[in-house]
Amino acid sequence: MADWLIGIIMGAVEGLTEFLPVSSTGHMILTGHLLGFDDERAKVFEVVIQLGSILAVVVIFWKRLWSLVGIGKVTDGPSLNLLHIIIGMIPAGVLGVLFHSAIKEVLFGPGPVVISLVAGGILMIVAEKFSKPSTARTLDEITYKQAFTIGMFQCLALWPGFSRSGSTISGGLLARVSHTAAAEYTFILAVPMMVAASGLDLIKSWDILSAADIPLFATGFITAFVVAMLAIVSFLKLLSRVKLTPFAYYRFILAAVFYFFIM
């Protein structure tokens, strides 16, 4: 298959699934397997196109991100600030730094991904069933305690297949944060976390890159960016109506497909 077509397909899958609670890792592994694109170059490619998805968040939430560093203000009252983001980053950041190699060796495989797809789906159903009325209906009403709780649930996203958004939105619901506020906080929190993780992986894999890969990587990056923009906007509109449960059942189906086609 032509590199440009692989770039479009993989970029579209990455952009569509990165911020939905369905596990981008599971979809990327499955798609790469079906396309025969799963060597070391493919792993570096996935890191690069993930940056395209991150850029989509930056573009959509640019006013909010500027306000976090003191440039501009989105509301006259109390609002989300940089400390909320730092608090949310600490749990997964510490765990990721301490156990980065072990996580890569133990959890990056078909078996662990199938388990996490199912476990993540169960978590989402449990969160929907046992969540109480929201005390933080908007992003600016999230407390530091709620930010830390969401950050703790983000640790689950270190396990490929759990889904960052699925884990953190579930944590937000259990901490009495609304679906939309939890999702928006999740997307903003993902920017520094994903930039750091992707940057580290890219530095470690730099020697694999070559000039011949630029067209493939550029195609994937641009596709991931455009599709992620559409996916984020659509998901935020959809989430207030359909909740997490349909995504949980989709994860169970994906786990079955993964089991029969990959394992």
Swiss-Prot record:
Q: Which GO terms describe its molecular function?
A: undecaprenyl-diphosphatase activity
Annotated EC: 3.6.1.27
The record's listing under PANTHER family reads: UNDECAPRENYL-DIPHOSPHATASE (PTHR30622:SF3)
Gene Ontology terms: cellular component: plasma membrane
Origin organism lineage? Bacteria, Bacillati, Bacillota, Bacilli, Bacillales
Tell me the gene name: uppP2
Localization, UniProt? Cell membrane
UniProt cross-references to InterPro entries, sorted A to Z:
UppP
Q: What is this protein called?
A: Undecaprenyl-diphosphatase 2
